[in-house]
Amino acid sequence: MALAMSFTSCVRENLDQCPPLRINIEVKDKNYFNVDQTVPDEKRNENQSFRSFVPSLSYRLSRLNDDGTQQVVVEEKGFGVEGDGLTYPVSFDPDMPFGKYVFTVWGGMKTRGELNLDKNELLLHPEHSQGDDVYQVCDTLVYDENHYCYTSEMERTKGKLVIWTENLPAGYHLMDTEVSQLYGIVNPSFLYSEETSVFHESEIEAGVKTKTSIFLAPSFQKDESVVDVNFHKNSGEGSSLSVLSPDDVKVSMERNKITVLKYVYDSDRNRFTIYMKVNDNWEEIHGMILD
């Protein structure tokens, strides 16, 4: 439905005081959709402050013209969120013309390199890194004498891969993980594009159960993201097996969902048994195929 717009001053002149456009920014995805079935110990109290979920923000308010083009009115880049409020309120100049506007917010980024404002898109895995746990929202709204207070709910752009390791032999303290077939870019409307991969290194502790978490964009194709994990010995510890390489595993990463894998080393057979957590149960994987 087309929304009528008025940029004339007659209506505003009849008002004692023009109400400024006010937007409360909230966090919608405070927990992952499947946190209870995957890593329940990571479930967060949803009454924590806004900044505990989204510590930094960038936002843009643009006027939406009749021809569909946008004109940037206000833009704030990469600032830290202060205070302990559950929402982050934004208020604009009360002299701003009535009309139709587009409000876009990005949050959680530690580096500006992830956000390309010129192209209005977010780079999900800069230089093949996991990047940050980034949120965004984009709302189209009407500002007039009757409509001036809105709420925008930020949603998570990525999912998370959790990898458990058990019974690694002594000396193996480094794990590298490469995940292919992931989306590389997302626009404010949550349309994902381009293909990329992620490479991640993490220190682990041999002989004990260790957990590693990696933020990952949704899979480029369902069930086609390949997880390639390798375990390395510290230099100088010497062994005929300096690298342990389990079989590759195919997964399907999704936005705001957790995928959990477990690699259990069997020293007697010199091999790994790999499991995926499905509906709160561990299912064994054979040759990329779930049992």
Where do the language-model regions lie?
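Hydrophobic, glycine-enriched assembly/anchoring segments
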Residues: 259-291
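Conserved "repeat-terminator" motif of extracellular CCP/Sushi domains
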Residues: 151-158, 219-221
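Bacterial Sec-dependent N-terminal signal peptides
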Residues: 1-39, 256, 280-291
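Structural motif
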Residues: 27-51, 164-171
